[in-house]
């Protein structure tokens, strides 16, 4: 037992303060799980002296769900001091104290668990951030910017850049169903799969087809993911795109912004799936925007969606800006639209502008 002792002001406690759970009057109450009244401690062999003035003692176990979590112990300098009234009153007090002590213990345990969880989540956030590659610094003939905002510490949105060579780049954006740690882990698996396929220099439709098979083999808790994948060929200025259920990418070209209207099944649901591929030759100033549904489907306080139309108008209005400026303008406008409300969904954005 760990002892907490109160005596009269100015008096010292002498004697043994450490004891096994079965020793002394306190130990007897704990062992028997019932009150122990000792009228004269000097004739009771179980007594362990703490205060030489003690003549009688009352020990009442504090029980919680049939388990002794402590003992309420009172000592008196008078012989035969404690009565049945003391036993009844203090038994009620001991029961209430037991509940309070257990609640305090559970609160402390909860606080420790929450602190550990927070440390784990922060570590997961750092790891996830490290998995997302920065925009390439090599000259692929594109200005690029990527933005990533999580509704929680970690999320299921992802983007990736695959270097196919000095002239060719793969660009991906994906969204795992659900949120939180499980979605983030599944997203990390998807990034690993893409990187393992990169040496094959797969074009978009074939990349999504192979990812669908590999993601499906590693499906966790019924999760799936949407993804959009594109390849860019510098020199030829050729863009190829395929889509697996992701928000349709946007393309600013010839003075207007429109959707690249490609559809396809999300990855990891059906085994044998093929994907359509669309290609276009781009010119300087053309802009490609990949975006997760957390942008267009963001709602304001009046239950209005930000919407793809608003997003396309923004791109048209700021088409002369850099890729970085366009990405920042989009996120600022979404924040303004929602009055800076907390994120209800992850927001991920990749902007590529042809130099």
Q: Each PLM stretch: what is its role?
A:
Residues 55-64, 84:
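A short, aliphatic-rich beta-strand micro-motif
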Residues 42-44, 55, 71-80, 176, ...:
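Short beta-strand-to-loop transition segments that serve as allosteric relay/switch motifs
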Residues 8-12, 32-59, 76, 268, ...:
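Signal-transducing coupling segments at domain and membrane junctions
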Residues 1-17, 21, 166:
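GAF sensory/regulatory domain recognition
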Residues 208, 228, 281-290, 295-355:
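C-terminal catalytic subdomain
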Residues 26, 60-78, 100, 292:
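Sensory-domain boundary capping and coupling elements
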Residues 109-289, 339-355:
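… and, occasionally, acidic/histidine-rich disordered N-termini of signaling adaptors
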Residues 91-98:
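Allosteric cytosolic regulatory segments
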């Amino acid at each position: 037992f760990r002892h907490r002792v109160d005596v009269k002001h100015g008096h010292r406690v002498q004697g043994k303060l450490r004891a096994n759970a079965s020793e002394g009057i306190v130990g007897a109450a704990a062992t028997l799980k019932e009150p122990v009244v000792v009228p004269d401690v000097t004739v009771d062999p179980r007594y362990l002296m703490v205060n030489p003035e003690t003549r009688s003692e009352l020990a009442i176990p504090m029980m919680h769900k049939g388990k002794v979590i402590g003992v309420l112990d009172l000592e008196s300098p008078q012989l035969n001091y404690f009565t049945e009234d003391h036993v009844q009153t203090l038994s009620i007090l001991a029961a209430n104290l037991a509940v309070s002590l257990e609640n305090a213990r559970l609160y402390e345990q909860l606080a420790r668990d929450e602190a550990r969880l927070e440390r784990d989540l922060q570590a997961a956030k750092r790891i996830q951030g490290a998995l997302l590659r920065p925009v390439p610094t090599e000259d692929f003939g594109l200005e690029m910017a990527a933005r990533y905002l999580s509704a929680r510490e970690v999320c299921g949105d992802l983007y990736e850049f695959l270097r196919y060579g000095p002239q060719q780049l793969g660009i991906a954006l994906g969204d795992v169903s659900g949120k939180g740690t499980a979605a983030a882990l599944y997203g990390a698996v998807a990034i690993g799969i893409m990187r393992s396929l990169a040496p094959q220099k797969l074009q978009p439709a074939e990349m999504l087809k192979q990812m669908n098979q590999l993601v499906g083999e590693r499906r966790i808790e019924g999760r799936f993911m949407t993804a959009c994948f594109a390849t860019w060929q510098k020199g030829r200025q050729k863009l190829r795109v395929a889509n697996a259920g992701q928000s349709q990418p946007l393309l600013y070209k010839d003075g207007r912004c429109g959707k690249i209207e490609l559809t396809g099944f999300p990855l990891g649901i059906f085994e044998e799936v093929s994907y359509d591929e669309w290609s276009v030759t781009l010119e300087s100033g053309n802009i490609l925007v990949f975006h997760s549904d957390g942008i267009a489907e963001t709602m304001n306080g009046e239950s209005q969606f930000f919407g793809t139309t608003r997003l396309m108008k923004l791109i048209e209005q700021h088409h002369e800006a850099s890729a970085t400026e366009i990405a920042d303008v989009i996120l600022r406008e979404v924040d303004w639209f929602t009055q800076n409300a907390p994120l209800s969904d992850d927001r991920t954005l990749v902007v590529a502008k042809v130099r």
